[in-house]
Amino acid sequence: MPGVKVKESEPFELALKKFKKQCEKAGILSEVRKREHFEKPSIKRKKKAIAARKRALKKQRKMMD
């Protein structure tokens, strides 16, 4: 869980920026968006297969160059 300790002389905007960066790095927002609506297991498998296919094609293109 991200947390930021704010110093006396530190402006709020800087602390907020640090917190947002930590949240992004931890993947909290993407996790929330993913869990926002129920996704059937069959759709999860389909998305996983499509992502694997994209990675394989990208790797293959990289090897060709």
From Swiss-Prot:
Region (Disordered): 39-65
UniProt key word Ribosomal protein: yes
Biased composition (Basic residues): 43-65
GO CC annotation terms, alphabetical: ribonucleoprotein complex; ribosome
Keyword rRNA-binding on entry: no
InterPro entries on file: Ribosomal_bS21 (IPR001911), Ribosomal_bS21_sf (IPR038380)
A Pfam family the protein falls into: Ribosomal_S21
Signal peptide location: none
UniProt similarity note: Belongs to the bacterial ribosomal protein bS21 family.
UniProt cross-references to HAMAP family, sorted A to Z: Ribosomal_bS21 (MF_00358)
Protein name: Small ribosomal subunit protein bS21
Organism the protein comes from: Pelobacter propionicus (strain DSM 2379 / NBRC 103807 / OttBd1)
